[in-house]
Every structure is written in structure tokens, then in C-alpha cells.
Amino acid sequence: MTTTTEFPSATAKARFVRVSPRKARRVIDLVRGRSVSDALDILRWAPQAASEPVAKVIASAAANAQNNNGLDPATLIVATVYADEGPTAKRIRPRAQGRAFRIRKRTSHITVVVESRPSKDQRSSKSSRARRAEGSKAAATAPAKKSSASKAPAKKAATKAESKTSETSEAKGGSD
């Protein structure tokens, strides 16, 4: 699977890892889209056994980005990460009365693509100006909508309110 990205990237693969792909995906979902340093911190404290091989692959992809492509490790983000199914080793567990159960020892291929994306502080000033302009346009149109949205109360509600006030005034006046 080849993916083209607009940012410079690096890839790392771990093949035939003795972890079920389903269990690896559970760990992978924790780190997808995060920075490499955050992902490694999360995986360091994750209790799942699959977190160790996933962390190794992410660290390898970061090292590839730094050494092969000359990318800054601080700007690396885990852009794409997935676990495909590898070959399954079949074993036999003897059971009672001559039976045998099949055990499937599943393997997975873990692939990580890290991208060097600029942090929010390093974005171009032009794009931030454009965002501010859009925000001011939205703010300018918002009050105009509010003024047109105010409506008069419904006739039925207005007549009920008037009748209640007249009843209370009559009750007060009649008791004097």
C-alpha cells in the first residue's frame, strides 16, 4: 500500500510480529494522529503486550525520518499506522479422550508512516490572517441574524398573560 502525502514522510515496517492483528489494532488506535513523542509516551505506559512492538516500529520510523530524510524529530506525527494479518501458525493441543484442538498462533505486519508537519506556531502568517478574516466575517454576520430572529410573542400566549394580570388586579381590588 503506497500513500502519497503533501508532507515529507518516512516509513517503517515490522513483519511477522507474534501479536494478533486485532490486539495490535487496539493499541494502534491509541496513537494514530499524535506526535511521535506523545505516541511513545502513551505506549510506554499502555498495559497491552502489543504496545512494545508498536512502539519499536514508531521509533524506527522516527529514526528513518531523521537519518535518511533529515527531518526534525520534534515535528514528526504518526500519520498512518495499520496492522495487517500475517501468516497463522497452527498448533495442536491434546485434549481428553484422544481429541485434539487446533491453536492458531496469529502474526501481524505493522506499518507506520510518520510525517513532518509544521507545528501550529510555525504556520505561515498568511494562513493565520486568512483565518482571522474568516472569523471576523462570521462575527459580523452573526448579530444581523439575531436581530431578525426576534419575534413577537404568539397571540394566544399574549392574551393569556393579559387575562391573568387582569384577574389578579381584580382579585386585589375586590378584596379591599
Curated annotation (Swiss-Prot):
GO molecular function: rRNA binding; structural constituent of ribosome
InterPro entries given in the database record: Ribosomal_uL22 (IPR001063), Ribosomal_uL22_bac/chlpt-type (IPR005727), Ribosomal_uL22_bac/org-type (IPR047867), Ribosomal_uL22_CS (IPR018260), Ribosomal_uL22_sf (IPR036394)
Record field: compositional bias (Low complexity): 136-152
A GO biological process held by the record: translation
Keywords: Ribonucleoprotein, Ribosomal protein, RNA-binding, rRNA-binding
Basic and acidic residues bias (residue ranges): 159-176
Chain residue ranges for the region called Disordered: 113-176
NCBIfam families, alphabetized: rplV_bact (TIGR01044)
Name of the protein in question: Large ribosomal subunit protein uL22
Lineage of source species: Bacteria, Bacillati, Actinomycetota, Actinomycetes, Mycobacteriales
